[in-house]
Amino acid sequence: MAAPEAWRARSCWFCEVAAATTMEATSREAAPAKSSASGPNAPPALFELCGRAVSAHMGVLESGVWALPGPILQSILPLLNIYYLERIEETALKKGLSTQAIWRRLWDELMKTRPSSLESVTCWRAKFMEAFFSHVLRGTIDVSSDRRLCDQRFSPLLHSSRHVRQLTICNMLQGATELVAEPNRRVLETLASSLHTLKFRHLLFSDVAAQQSLRQLLHQLIHHGAVSQVSLYSWPVPESALFILILTMSAGFWQPGPGGPPCRLCGEASRGRAPSRDEGSLLLGSRRPRRDAAERCAAALMASRRKSEAKQMPRAAPAARVTRRSTQESLTAGGTDLKRELHPPATSHEAPGTKRSPSAPAATSSASSSTSSYKRAPASSAPQPKPLKRFKRAAGKKGARTRQGPGAESEDLYDFVFIVAGEKEDGEEMEIGEVACGALDGSDPSCLGLPALEASQRFRSISTLELFTVPLSTEAALTLCRLLSSWVSLESLTLSFNGLGSNIFRLLDSLRALSGQAGCRLRALHLSDLFSPLPILELTRAIVRALPLLRVLSIRVDHPSQRDNPGVPGNAGPPSHIIGDEEIPENCLEQLEMGFPRGAQPAPLLCSVLKASGSLQQLSLDSATFASPQDFGLVLQTLKEYNLALKRLSFHDMNLADCQSEVLFLLQNLTLQEITFSFCRLFEKRPAQFLPEMVAAMKGNSTLKGLRLPGNRLGNAGLLALADVFSEDSSSSLCQLDISSNCIKPDGLLEFAKRLERWGRGAFGHLRLFQNWLDQDAVTAREAIRRLRATCHVVSDSWDSSQAFADYVSTM
């Protein structure tokens, strides 16, 4: 005991000395007038002065501070800057101290934003450090403006990087260049191991240097890192080259930029293990031709971008219309030099001492001999997609320009990212910059000297891809579809409001091809759009047929189907193999969510999907309309007979006022555990007769655990009727009840609470009361909630009921 006592004495002596020194310095600067110790201008307390002195000299005293007793350390923690506060976290936990309140206060004072009410923050330290990293990277915070953020001994980016799980890149790729710079090499290495999600928001057009930095960043974070999810948000006018770069890198393809330093990690990996030819063919899809059209198209873009970046000048939009024959002749004339440009020596992008893998020469030779193989390939060896619409020249480029010289072909190649397939004769004109999915005459485009992606290196790829409000042009949609066909590592795909149009058929074909790949992991698909060329139920049937191993399917179409005009070339309607009438095979769906447009839906089509989904556990129908209550009853009967594993059923924004017998049928189902009727107008007709029948059905159901009734105009009378579900003679095991937005007043809620107390059923779980009229009598509402909290967990809000005036008038 002598040692701890001695240390405690020394620590107290140190505190007194530091405090005395600080007070002496303070007294010299202070006014000579004395102030009361309790006044507003009183000097800081002794312990606070001591803490300030200690925090100012943490570089020397850090180890000693860590050894301080818990009570002393607890007073010093709020005075530390963020770097030492982060470093002392483990020691504080061992002493039974928590820093969460300090980090929360730092968030409120420095970040000055309020987290979303839907967000549950489990660690304020990690949240603060992640946000701090992003602000420093973008230059939106000045670390010198606050002593808690400034310390010359620490790098803000490096110190906070290990807490970053999600990184957002915005606008003109701000931050990408800084992260790949040599001074931040350790920062990038730390991010590669900590970062899981990479997001792009509101991207704008960027220069060549920024895109080259992005290429290196994606290579490090995805190919050599732990990033498993890439999400793109709100990109109204996507830049095709940048979008396809992000896609191809996310899919695992890599071609280093010209003149860039060799990748050290690539060199280490190649020395450790060389990929086999079998592995490469598996990743690229062994069931498809070795030179898949999409891979060739994406490789064309990547190769041409490398050529453009080597010249460090922006792409010039073509202004000449050339014939197919002149295009082929010009490209063939410069084929030898072009191949040399597109295939730089290995030393330009491999680490010194790296041995070439056995598969590398084969891949290179296959690409370099593409011209001769094209001549031998039959015209039917590649699929023949329909011609796609042309794109206009870039603004500001007028007149025709004849390109000559050995470098002219490569400038044209930038715009020949995709070559229109299926044109008739050599004399037809095509505009450079036109996009398509095949080669000339639908054959191999290697006659243009473009390498297949087999010549690119293949690395790890992401497992989750999300595109929110990113309109997909034809070439972008085509590239996505063809990459998807071999993206076996992809587990979840979200396409939300991308304007796919008729490209949905290509998407279905690519998903079908992906499903046939060995090792396909796609288990979740979320698809939503304003319009669809297929009715939503036909689209659902097609997806389920294409992906029988899918577990989660969420599909939503906001407006009725508008089939494309058959008179327009390329829009001749859906292929027969997509909308076939054959029976849907058994699938593995466990969760199905459907959002319907206006108009009655054919119940037999929905029933056919449900019959094939015997493993379905959760079904959600949003805005579904049926021709008659009998059709709705047919759907419910199908659920009872074929979906025995169904546990959760949800209906939202559906008029079920005339389907009361069907609702009672559901409440008597002894397999369902949770039912949701959200804004379904349940009690609009015959409430006096229907409510007792509904309560009786629920009292006899012992398996139902949750009932959600938001937005059904339940009112006080309906709430008091529901209270009978918890009476002594009830066998109900209901433990979650949602009665939000139901015109409930404080007096009705108080009577409901008293009935629960009288029956003494004990705590039954959660009660949600959002957006009810509880502000009309705040005292009564507080008393009701106090009583309810003795019975259940109550979740409510302070809502202005005057917003519900229209709803009130409708119930008068």
From Swiss-Prot:
SMART domains: LRR_RI. PANTHER family: LEUCINE-RICH REPEAT-CONTAINING PROTEIN 41 (PTHR15354:SF1), MUF1 (PTHR15354). This is Leucine-rich repeat-containing protein 41. The Elongin BC complex binding domain is also known as BC-box with the consensus [APST]-L-x(3)-C-x(3)-[AILV]. One of its GO terms (cellular component) is cytoplasm. It comes from Pongo abelii. GO terms for biological process: protein ubiquitination. Residues 387-401 have a biased composition (Basic residues). Residues 268-408 are annotated as: Disordered. Gene3D superfamilies: Ribonuclease Inhibitor. The keyword Repeat applies. The modification Phosphoserine is found at residues 155, 276, 326, 357, 373. Probable substrate recognition component of an ECS (Elongin BC-CUL2/5-SOCS-box protein) E3 ubiquitin ligase complex which mediates the ubiquitination and subsequent proteasomal degradation of target proteins. Pathway: Protein modification; protein ubiquitination. Residues 354-381 have a biased composition (Low complexity). The modification Phosphothreonine is found at residue 327. Part of an E3 ubiquitin-protein ligase complex with Elongin BC (ELOB and ELOC), RBX1 and CUL5. Component of a probable ECS(LRRC41) complex which contains CUL5, RNF7/RBX2, Elongin BC and LRRC41. Interacts with CUL5, RNF7, ELOB and ELOC. Keywords: Leucine-rich repeat, Phosphoprotein, Repeat, Ubl conjugation pathway. The gene is LRRC41. Residues 45-54 are annotated as: Interaction with Elongin BC complex. LRR repeats lie at residues 487-507, 518-530, 531-555, 613-635, 636-659, 701-728, 731-752.
